[in-house]
């Protein structure tokens, strides 16, 4: 994932070329780099910021198409570009147009706060996920991969006046239930890969991490692997 959020994460064409060439040379050819259909996968975190930095949708489309071609020319088979779906309501954003116009191959989310009111019980948020996944699977013209979060609490980062809500009663059992719903989605849709995005490995200051702690031990990691949720 290219996390080019502020401070000043928007980049012009020259810097974009430099950064993406470094990705090609240093990362995409690594044998452990994740691929779909043989192509390295890159998720764009902040699409509006990217478009602003590259001076509009048309020039961004040209830059991304050239990026894909450079990946192909480097013997990488091309590039699988993934768009992060963010605050989509079907009316006010143009993400449904961007997905096709900019040449994205799939989309997913980064965390629950982008799609739902997070200031409530985890179970209530999880119950809303399958209908949203179904809607997005047909609305954008590209495959949608489901996303599951551990929770949300970024209050350690801010004064009390800037807190954005806290997910209540998140626990490994509810996380496992959400993973099972995501697996059901993947099992029943014709996707180019069996991919579920999880937030996150180590976002301690956002209250969404898989790593073990004193409160739940290895509970979240066991929900992913030890209980056989995802299978093979």
Question: Where do the PLM segments sit?
Answer:
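Glycan-processing catalytic domains of CAZymes
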Residues: 1-232
């Amino acid at each position: 994932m290219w996390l080019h959020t502020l401070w000043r994460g928007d980049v012009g064409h020259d810097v974009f070329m430099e950064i993406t060439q470094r990705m090609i040379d240093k990362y995409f050819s690594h044998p452990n780099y994740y691929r779909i259909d043989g192509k390295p996968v890159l998720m764009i975190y902040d699409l509006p910021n990217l478009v602003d930095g590259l001076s509009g949708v048309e020039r961004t489309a040209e830059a991304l198409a050239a990026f894909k071609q450079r990946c192909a020319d480097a013997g990488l088979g091309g590039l699988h570009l993934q768009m992060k779906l963010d605050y989509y309501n079907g009316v006010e954003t143009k993400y449904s147009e961007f997905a096709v116009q900019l040449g994205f191959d799939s989309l997913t989310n980064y965390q629950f706060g982008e799609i739902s009111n997070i200031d409530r019980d985890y179970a209530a948020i999880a119950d809303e996920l399958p209908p949203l996944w179904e809607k997005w699977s047909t609305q954008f013209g590209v495959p949608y991969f489901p996303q599951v979060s551990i929770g949300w609490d970024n209050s350690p980062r801010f004064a009390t006046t800037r807190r954005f809500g806290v997910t209540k009663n998140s626990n490994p059992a509810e996380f496992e239930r959400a993973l099972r719903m995501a697996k059901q989605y993947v099992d029943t849709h014709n996707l180019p890969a069996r991919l579920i995005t999880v937030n996150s490995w180590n976002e301690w200051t956002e209250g969404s991490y898989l790593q073990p702690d004193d409160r739940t031990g290895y509970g979240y990691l066991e929900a992913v692997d030890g209980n056989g949720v995802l299978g093979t």
